[in-house]
Amino acid sequence: MAFCGPRTAARLSHSTRALHYTHRSFASPRTLNEVVIASAARTPIGSFQGTLSSLPATKLGSIAIKAAVERAGIPADEVKEVYMGNVLQAGQGQAPSRQATLGAGLAISTPTTTINKVCASGMKSVMLAAQSLMCGHQQVMVAGGMESMSNVPYCMSRGATPYGGVKLEDIIVKDGLTDVYNKFHMGNCAENTAKKLSISREEQDGFAITSYTRSKAAWDSGLIANEIAPVTIAQKGKPDIIVQEDEEYKRVDFSKFPKLKTVFQKDNGTVTAANSSTLNDGAAALVLMTAEAANRLNVTPLARIVAFADAAVDPIDFPIAPAYAIPKLLSEAGLKKEDIAMWEINEAFSVVVLANIKMLDIDPARVNVNGGAVSLGHPIGMSGARIVGHMAHALRKGQFGIAGICNGGGGASAVLIEKL
């Protein structure tokens, strides 16, 4: 065993004091910073193999990020970090969020991280950025989500090619829409929830029709247009195409709703193509900053982030997971459900929203008042960021809004904001 003399001990004591000082100099602030949403922008949502299908998710992400930064009215180099949700990353190349960030014209020195929490990816990006800002690690960040389901490839397992041909798997289904624990489509989980909570097909069809009518009314009134970052698509030898409106909500024939066969459960099933969300392309981005940074940069924020929470349940019960995350929010904020003016619960399936309305006992008239993913579309990496951004635009001053979204594996994320 080694012993040290007085001089060595003195040097060690001095070094210890220096290390202690260094540690303290990098400590988090004693009080958390207030975080505000400076801007929120999104691309239109394109139908599967539709108007936006020529653009990869990273390009759509660049368009959303660039628009959000411009609308915040700040120099691009003020953004110090970017988080972007993206689920179906196969074939996109390294670091999709980095591609989207540099494509938006942000500084080469901007660190980026791609977030995958399945359908909650875009919302989790907002939550993680808010945490970084609250702790004082950064002052200005961009967070959002992006997906181009039209460009997702097929895959083949590595190894010897078997006799009789090869088997290709659809990455949309394999990595995005399959419950890996029960080895079936997420729609089977939706059927399970419908059965448990006695939610009929008629209720789900009725909800879907309401989603379409609300989306159309919101677009007709001009309410959604201020969220949109138009997408320009170059054409060879022809004028460019400018896409500035969601594509999916206009592609509906209500007369077919009661005639459609159920998709996931043939006997006594309730979930159909009409009362489920669709495969889509799009991106959304929000500029988040501390209240101090907003003052310094003369930014008038849209809203402030009050609280956020995650929850997890049995994977088969993923549709009801928001009903476990949302009470955490209300408790943390000291609010009651009656204090919430607007609810955005992502419409992965109509039964998801109906189940959460039932479990939370909330007013359906305040839920998804301008439509949702069943009618607008569900680019899975984008949707969580889209509903937070939509609330930041749609709420009135002083109102509170909650956005919740379920995700595969039995998870959910939720965010509470206040309009400023």
UniProtKB/Swiss-Prot annotation:
GO biological process entries: fatty acid beta-oxidation
Enzyme class: transferase
FT transit peptide: 1-33
Gene3D superfamilies found in the cross-reference section: 3.40.47.10
Binding site for K(+): Y212, A273, A274, V374
Subcellular location: Mitochondrion
Molecular functions per Gene Ontology: acetyl-CoA C-acetyltransferase activity; metal ion binding
Binding-site list for CoA: Y212, R251, V252, D253, K256, S277
Keywords: Acyltransferase, Fatty acid metabolism, Lipid metabolism, Metal-binding, Mitochondrion, Potassium, Transferase, Transit peptide
InterPro entries given in the database record: Thiolase (IPR002155), Thiolase-like (IPR016039), Thiolase_acyl_enz_int_AS (IPR020615), Thiolase_AS (IPR020610), Thiolase_C (IPR020617), Thiolase_CS (IPR020613), Thiolase_N (IPR020616)
Enzyme Commission numbers on file: 2.3.1.9
Site (Increases nucleophilicity of active site Cys): H378
Chief localization: mitochondrion
Active-site feature positions: C119, C406
Reaction equation(s) it catalyzes: 2 acetyl-CoA = acetoacetyl-CoA + CoA; propanoyl-CoA + acetyl-CoA = 2-methyl-3-oxobutanoyl-CoA + CoA
CC annotations in GO: mitochondrion
The protein's annotated pathway: Lipid metabolism; fatty acid beta-oxidation
Subunit structure of this chain's protein: Homotetramer.
Family: Belongs to the thiolase-like superfamily. Thiolase family.
Function noted in UniProt: This is one of the enzymes that catalyzes the last step of the mitochondrial beta-oxidation pathway, an aerobic process breaking down fatty acids into acetyl-CoA. Using free coenzyme A/CoA, catalyzes the thiolytic cleavage of medium- to long-chain 3-oxoacyl-CoAs into acetyl-CoA and a fatty acyl-CoA shortened by two carbon atoms. The activity of the enzyme is reversible and it can also catalyze the condensation of two acetyl-CoA molecules into acetoacetyl-CoA. Thereby, it plays a major role in ketone body metabolism.
Protein name in the entry: Acetyl-CoA acetyltransferase B, mitochondrial
Gene name of the record: acat1-b
